[in-house]
């Protein structure tokens, strides 16, 4: 059995952790770093095939030294600080880009052919049929719900102009480790999931204090209290373009409010692993969702979008802060992004790759929105109601490729007597109705006060 002193960076061994059911388990983990505090060694571990947000510092008592695997010196991959350059099998290291090609045996309905209701052996409660059209290639999201990343096509070169861009080239030993222990934001204390490039001198602090209105950071509670006596903001900068009840949205220009935008990106990076932070926020707009009480407008989440997108992206980054997750706010952010696209008269899609949580939220939103349209179709003169994929896209502002991939994901497309039938089974309908009963938060278009700008005519934004 190995000794504690023999453990080095790059070793792999089982590590004790508690799972979601509060049961002990011993998953395989990799040692990313070792540090000594007052003669006591601590080991920073990444659990193989688990999300990086679960990485943590552990003591030697949680390590199974009998099954340790030392790094191989003859590894062909270049190493850095004793670590292999890649981790096959770790989902956050492998950017999964799945492309499902529809073969002649599994055709997709034409975008413009009308659809109509069609019964199927009495088992279907509602059905929509589309006339056969040309076969097309469909770029679909992957179907693994635990996947960290997803794409709808061949990856393009990383953009180097945004505030948060998709790029793994800086994924080294430093950025693989969480560097902020805890963040105090208003009445919440947040435990970061990932690395964020805050100034080095702040990474040794037990708590990083943020002003919840301007997002400036301080070293201590005293610094924050001193700042609050001078900060007169009680809401994000920019224009309030939506308010209903306690929920508001503020539109923030990344050029006009550069400091706030950069601070927002630093905070967001603590909870987004698939993006690399850059400081050029000028080409971006930020839409911050807040919850109002007597003390002000408290940030709940946000999404950003490019002022000019050549690829129809209506979201660049999207995040609901951890204290507000699993409460319907993520779907509300997504719904708001499509509401803006409707006002702009465009269809939109989120920038890929999506995080695992983002992918789940988008799949759920697309499914509910499309099913809502299909189930609301009315028949005329006793005939089956008809609709095309283009019409679904125009009504919802969801890009056609996302409409098709969602229909495939829900397994609604069937070929029957020369027609493409979209069949809604009892299970699909019942599941949708149950989900909609739980979806209490919705965007009210009448409460939106938004005038889109033509950024192509505004020079350098």
UniProtKB/Swiss-Prot annotation:
Covalent cross-link Glycyl lysine isopeptide (Lys-Gly) (interchain with G-Cter in SUMO2), where: 378
Predominant location: nucleus
The organism's place on the tree of life at top rank: Eukaryota
This enzyme's EC code(s): 2.3.1.48, 2.3.1.-
Segments for region (Disordered): 70-168
Keywords noted in UniProt: Acetylation, Activator, Acyltransferase, Centromere, Chromatin regulator, Chromosome, Cytoplasm, Cytoskeleton, DNA damage, DNA repair, Growth regulation, Immunity, Innate immunity, Isopeptide bond, Kinetochore, Metal-binding, Nucleus, Phosphoprotein, Transcription, Transcription regulation, Transferase, Ubl conjugation, Zinc, Zinc-finger
Subcellular location: Nucleus; Chromosome; Cytoplasm; Chromosome, Centromere, Kinetochore
Tudor-knot domain segment(s): 8-65
Top class in the EC scheme: transferase
Cellular component GO terms, alphabetical: cytoplasm; kinetochore; NuA4 histone acetyltransferase complex; nucleolus; nucleus; perinuclear region of cytoplasm; piccolo histone acetyltransferase complex; spindle pole
Biased composition (Basic and acidic residues): 90-100
Regulation: Acyltransferase and acetyltransferase activities are activated by phosphorylation and autoacetylation. Autoacetylation activates the histone acetyltransferase activity.
Region of interest called Interaction with ATF2, as start-end residue ranges on this chain: 316-461
Post-translational events: Phosphorylated on Ser-86 and Ser-90; enhanced during G2/M phase. The phosphorylated form has a higher activity. Phosphorylation at Ser-90 by CDK1 or CDK9 is a prerequisite for phosphorylation at Ser-86 by GSK3. Phosphorylation at Ser-86 by GSK3 (GSK3A or GSK3B) activates acetyltransferase and acyltransferase activities. Phosphorylation at Ser-90 by CDK9 promotes KAT5 recruitment to chromatin. Phosphorylation by VRK1 following DNA damage promotes KAT5 association with chromatin and histone acetyltransferase activity.
PTM-bearing positions, type Phosphoserine: 86, 90, 147
Similarity comment text for this entry: Belongs to the MYST (SAS/MOZ) family.
Protein name as catalogued: Histone acetyltransferase KAT5
Organism of this sequence: Pongo abelii (Sumatran orangutan)
Gene: KAT5
């Amino acid at each position: 059995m190995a000794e504690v002193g023999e453990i080095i960076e790059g070793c792999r061994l089982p590590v004790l952790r508690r799972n979601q059911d509060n049961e002990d388990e011993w998953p395989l983990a990799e040692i990313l770093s070792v540090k000594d505090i007052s003669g006591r060694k601590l080991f920073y571990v990444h659990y193989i095939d688990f999300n990086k947000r679960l990485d943590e510092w552990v003591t030697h008592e949680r390590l199974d030294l009998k099954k340790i695997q030392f790094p191989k010196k003859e590894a062909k991959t270049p190493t850095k600080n004793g670590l292999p350059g890649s981790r096959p099998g770790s989902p956050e290291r492998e950017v999964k880009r799945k492309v499902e090609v529809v073969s002649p045996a599994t055709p997709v309905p034409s975008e413009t052919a009308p659809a109509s209701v069609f019964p199927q052996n009495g088992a279907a409660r509602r059905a929509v049929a589309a006339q056969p059209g040309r076969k097309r290639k469909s770029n679909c999201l992957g179907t693994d719900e635990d996947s960290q990343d997803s794409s709808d096509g061949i990856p393009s070169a990383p953009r180097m102009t945004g505030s948060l861009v998709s790029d793994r080239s800086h994924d080294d030993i430093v950025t693989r480790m969480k560097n902020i222990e805890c963040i105090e934001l208003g009445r919440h204390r947040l435990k970061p999931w990932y690395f964020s490039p805050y100034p080095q001198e702040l990474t040794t602090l037990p708590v990083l204090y943020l002003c919840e209105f301007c997002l400036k950071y301080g070293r201590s509670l005293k610094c924050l209290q001193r700042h609050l006596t001078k900060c007169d903001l009680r809401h994000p900068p920019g224009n309030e373009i939506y308010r209903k009840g306690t929920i508001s949205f503020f539109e923030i220009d990344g050029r006009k409010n550069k400091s706030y935008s950069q601070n927002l990106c630093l905070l967001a990076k603590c909870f987004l692993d698939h993006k690399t932070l850059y400081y050029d926020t000028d080409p971006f707009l930020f839409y911050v969702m807040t919850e109002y009480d007597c003390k002000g407008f408290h940030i709940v989440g946000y999404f950003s979008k490019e002022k000019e997108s050549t690829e129809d992206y209506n979201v660049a980054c999207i995040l609901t802060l951890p204290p507000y997750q699993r409460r319907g706010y993520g779907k509300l952010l997504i719904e708001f992004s499509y509401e803006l696209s409707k006002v702009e008269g465009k269809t939109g899609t989120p920038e890929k790759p999506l995080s695992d949580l983002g992918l789940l939220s988008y799949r759920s939103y697309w499914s509910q929105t499309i099913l809502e349209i299909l189930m609301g179709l009315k028949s005329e003169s006793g005939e089956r109601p008809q609709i095309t994929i283009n019409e679904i896209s125009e009504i919802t502002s969801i890009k056609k490729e996302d409409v098709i991939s969602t229909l495939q994901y829900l397994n609604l497309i069937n070929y029957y007597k020369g027609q493409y039938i979209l069949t809604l089974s009892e299970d699909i309908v019942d599941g949708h109705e149950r989900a909609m009963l739980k979806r209490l938060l919705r965007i009210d278009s009448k409460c939106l006060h938004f005038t889109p700008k033509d950024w192509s005519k505004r020079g350098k934004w």
